[in-house]
A protein has these predicted regions:
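Positively charged
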Residues: 1-173
Length: 173
């Protein structure tokens, strides 16, 4: 396993529509392991393949927050939202590709998602609360959408300028 560099917005690779994973190869398994390690190291609760420069429909997440609870790492290949509730919830979202920037985003409070597991089985689960927000946020990445795309133009521009400045500072370092 290895930690991969996380792309920082603005980067055109973060805005691309990702291709489906065609086969569950050793490379896909390695990508999933690397993504989990990268996510935990960041630290974060979710990571999508395009955030590490791979335009494939693969996400990882683990939204367990309780200190004494065991981790629940999840790998979702080709995830699809099959149902979303009419009820909405608002969470303050952040993103590993938009470091230290947070904003309230409204999304469906509950969603049902179907995906392929690394062992090739089809899985389906209903997510609520933070898990629902996270899975929707990560699936958005697969469609080239960032959480700041839900914000007003002015807020989005301000955050983008901050990220451009951060990238310039990191390039100088």
């Amino acid at each position: 396993m290895s930690i991969r560099p996380i792309l920082i917005h603005p980067d055109p690779r973060l805005k691309k529509l990702c291709d489906p994973v065609e086969s569950l190869s050793t490379e896909i398994g390695q990508l999933a392991e690397d993504m989990l390690e990268t996510m935990y190291d960041a630290p974060g609760i979710g990571l999508a393949a395009p955030q590490v420069g791979v335009t494939r429909r693969l996400i990882v997440m683990d939204c367990v927050k309780e200190a004494e609870a065991p981790p629940r790492p999840m790998v979702l290949v080709n995830p699809v939202i099959t149902w979303s509730s009419e009820a909405r919830s608002v969470y303050e979202e952040g993103c590993l590709s938009i470091p230290e920037q947070y904003a309230d985003v409204e999304r469906p409070a509950e969603v049902r998602v179907r995906w392929t597991a690394l062992d090739g089985t089809t899985q389906e689960e209903e997510f609520k609360g933070l898990w629902a927000t996270c899975v929707q946020h990560e699936i958005d990445h697969l469609d080239g959408k960032l959480f700041i795309d839900y914000l007003t133009g002015l807020k989005r521009q301000m955050i983008t300028r901050r990220m451009e400045k951060l990238k310039r500072e990191r390039a100088r370092a």
